[in-house]
UniProtKB/Swiss-Prot annotation:
Role, per record: Catalyzes the decarboxylation of orotidine 5'-monophosphate (OMP) to uridine 5'-monophosphate (UMP).
Protein name (Swiss-Prot/TrEMBL): Orotidine 5'-phosphate decarboxylase
NCBIfam families: PRK00230.1, pyrF
GO CC aspect terms: cytosol
Cleavable signal peptide: none
UniProt similarity note: Belongs to the OMP decarboxylase family. Type 1 subfamily.
Species for this entry: Bacillus cytotoxicus (strain DSM 22905 / CIP 110041 / 391-98 / NVH 391-98)
Pfam families for the chain: OMPdecase (PF00215)
EC numbers for this chain: 4.1.1.23
Catalytic activity of the protein: orotidine 5'-phosphate + H(+) = UMP + CO2
Subunit architecture: Homodimer.
PROSITE patterns: OMPDECASE (PS00156)
Gene: pyrF
Length: 238
């Protein structure tokens, strides 16, 4: 199965995760563990998923003073997760501190986790950004600014909308990692996300990784839905 397709385990606890993963016995997935699940189950959920052979994107979006983020990342790296993130709005010093913590905390003989930054949440519209957050740039300009700052700080890439990927390729180059949530099958509701795209569109726009949640986790047949997303993402004709 594709390692560039990340399945969001947006469940309230381990019981629901176990029920979901029964559909994928023997398969190694790349999964995302977010705040809800991690805060409920703690590091034990990471250990459980690793024992099952899955890769893990631990999506906690750290945003604090540099020393606190450094210490937190040192702890997270010791869990042997594969990807972590911070908010780019925390600034360059904070992002550099995150990398230092990951290097110090990584397990012996292992590479440090991929570290990416959130530019703007996919629930953020330009009106919201200007009116409520107080950023006067256009949404595209703000995302590009944060992405450039992220690259200059030494991080591997950003979380962004698929619609922003082409511009970020221009600004940050082809090797810069773009992780894009807000992915839905064409038949699904968009729910609370504003900037969404299909797996096919994400591929066409050049995303490095896509994160898919409800289209798979809420499907009547999760494995079948996963395969459909995977085929669209990889451009496989069936």
């Amino acid at each position: 199965m594709s390692k560039s397709l990340i399945v969001a385990l947006d469940f309230p606890g381990k019981k629901e995760v176990e029920q979901f993963l029964q559909h994928f016995e023997g398969e190694e997935l790349f999964v995302k563990v977010g705040m809800e699940l991690f805060y409920k189950e703690g590091p034990a959920i990471i250990t459980y998923l690793k024992e099952k052979g899955h890769k893990i994107f631990l999506d906690l979006k750290l945003h604090d003073i540099p020393n606190t983020v450094k210490s937190a990342m040192r702890s997270l790296a010791s869990l042997d997760v594969d990807m972590v993130n911070v908010h780019a709005a925390g600034g360059s010093s904070m992002m550099k501190a995150a990398l230092e913590g990951l290097e110090e905390g990584k397990q012996e003989g292992k590479e440090r986790p991929i570290c990416i930054a959130v530019t703007q949440l996919t629930s953020t519209s330009e009106v919201m950004m200007k009116k409520e957050i107080g950023i006067e740039k256009t949404l595209e300009e703000a995302v590009a600014h944060y992405a450039k700052l992220t690259k200059e700080s030494g991080l591997d890439g950003v979380v962004c909308s698929t619609l922003e990927v082409p511009k970020l390729r221009e600004v940050c180059g082809d090797e810069f990692v773009t992780v894009t949530p807000g992915i839905r099958l064409a038949s699904d509701d968009v729910n609370d996300q504003v900037r969404v795209a299909t797996p096919k569109r994400a591929r066409e726009l050049g995303s490095s990784y896509i994160v898919v949640g409800r289209s798979i986790t809420k499907a009547e047949n999760p494995l079948e839905a996963y395969q459909t997303v995977k085929q669209q993402w990889e451009g496989v004709t069936v």
